[in-house]
Design a protein with these regions (language model features):
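A short hydrophobic beta-strand segment most commonly corresponding to one strand
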Residues: 62, 82, 109, 124-141
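Short strand-connecting beta-turns/loops that link adjacent beta-strands
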Residues: 56-57, 78, 97, 123-124
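Asparagine-centered strand-capping/turn motif at beta-strand->loop junctions
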Residues: 119-121
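Short, conserved beta-strand element in jelly-roll/cupin
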Residues: 63-66, 75-92, 132-134
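Structural motif
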Residues: 89-91, 115, 125
Length: 145
């Protein structure tokens, strides 16, 4: 059995992000220009996520996570997703491709319907920029089975 969630706030909370605040998530939504330094100066070095772009075609979310944090294994039925690594290192597992280490400046693409999982493996907080369908459905395996 699979579980489906398309609410960004609950996805982040259920993936282990210690604090998620919807006002913070939307604080920089559709900002013309913002730097990672400005985001970190405002939000700090803890775990956080901000949606910097949102419209009927796509969304962009900057996600900062601590070493060892990541997300649950999941896929998206509606759309592909891609990420730009803004700072640090992540381990990416992609079904059919295996596990890879990605670092600052790398770009990762995952086709819709492909299981994947992400973990921060840096010694310090790492940041990725996720670009996908607005409020995309995340499909998870039911952990109770």
């Amino acid at each position: 059995m699979k579980k489906i969630d398309s609410d960004l706030e609950s996805v982040l909370i259920n993936d282990g992000m210690s604090e998620v605040n919807w006002d913070t998530l939307k604080k920089y939504q559709n900002t013309t220009n913002i730097s990672l330094k400005e985001l970190r100066d405002d939000l700090g070095l803890g775990s956080w996520a901000v949606r910097t772009a949102f419209n009927e075609n796509y969304q962009g979310v900057v996600i900062q996570q601590q070493p060892g944090e990541g997300n649950r294994k999941h896929y998206y039925p509606e759309a592909d997703e891609n990420w730009v690594i803004m700072d640090g290192e992540f381990e990416w597992w992609i079904d059919g491709k295996g596990t890879m280490k990605v670092t600052t400046g790398d770009i990762v693409n995952v086709k819709r319907g492909t299981w994947h999982q992400i973990t921060c493996i840096s010694d310090t907080p790492a940041v990725r920029y996720a670009i996908n369908w607005p409020d995309v459905s995340h499909v998870y395996e039911d952990e109770d089975e």
